[in-house]
Amino acid sequence: MAWPGPLLLKDRKGRAYLVFPKEGGVFHHHKGSVPHEALLEAGPGGVVRTHLGEELSVHRPTLEEYLLHMKRSATPTYPKDASAMVTLLDLAPGMRVLEAGTGSGGLTLFLARAVGEKGLVESYEARPHHLAQAERNVRAFWQVENVRFHLGKLEEAELEEAAYDGVALDLMEPWKVLEKAALALKPDRFLVAYLPNITQVLELVRAAEAHPFRLERVLEVGWREWEVRLPVAHPRFQQVGHTAFLVALRRWKAS
């Protein structure tokens, strides 16, 4: 029996569960259990029932769903921010992108899918346990071999000059890597940083003035979901609040 990658199960209340099917495995729900073989037989888009009769729908997880439910060793980059970073970086298939601060690998997956099988993501993480978890997360969801993981700090890495089409940073002190990023980034391409607080934003923008970078924009990404139960519609009571600021810098040719 060929075992697929991760599957997402949803119960009648919309609660989601990420499952990695394996031979002899069993999924346990508070309203019963179901063997992994049954999930494979139902397949994505199908339905299974636990031994107590609870109905569960079976799905292939989207990238957003996978990021929200995968195991995490660090605070995740939310899907709304990761997709915005890909847009700000202006990535396309075949490009080469540099990432620092791999974390749990969520942003890495967005970058890898954006550059495609002919592109390349070079991801640096200084903490071994974060890097190990990130590599497991990425390999479980994304079978395309277009990500290289590196243990270490970006500022200490040996990089080719003007070899990258984009730089994505999720670091507490991204200003420390600006010199290295400027060396590696192609002219007229973008560096995008993910920063939780505005003090970090100000520090980064101030530091960028000493390097061949120009500030393009600073933004927050909103995400407002609605509850629609005919004939009633209203915003959901639980909303995603502030997650981070995104800072986009454009690399200029050094004068």
Curated annotation (Swiss-Prot):
It catalyses: adenosine(58) in tRNA + S-adenosyl-L-methionine = N(1)-methyladenosine(58) in tRNA + S-adenosyl-L-homocysteine + H(+). Its EC number is 2.1.1.220. This is tRNA (adenine(58)-N(1))-methyltransferase TrmI. GO terms for molecular function: tRNA (adenine(58)-N1)-methyltransferase activity. The lineage of its organism: Bacteria, Thermotogati, Deinococcota, Deinococci, Thermales. GO terms for cellular component: tRNA (m1A) methyltransferase complex. Catalyzes the S-adenosyl-L-methionine-dependent formation of N(1)-methyladenine at position 58 (m1A58) in tRNA. Is required for cell growth at extreme temperatures. Keywords: Methyltransferase, S-adenosyl-L-methionine, Transferase, tRNA processing. Belongs to the class I-like SAM-binding methyltransferase superfamily. TRM61 family. InterPro entries: SAM-dependent_MTases_sf, TRM61_C, tRNA_MeTrfase_Gcd14. Contains a large catalytic C-terminal domain that binds S-adenosyl-L-methionine and a smaller N-terminal domain that may play a role in tRNA recognition. Domains are connected by a linker region. GO terms for biological process: tRNA methylation; tRNA processing. It comes from Thermus thermophilus (strain ATCC BAA-163 / DSM 7039 / HB27). The gene is trmI. Homotetramer composed of a dimer of dimers. S-adenosyl-L-methionine binds at residues 104-107, 125, 130, 155, 170. Pfam families: GCD14, TrmI-like_N.
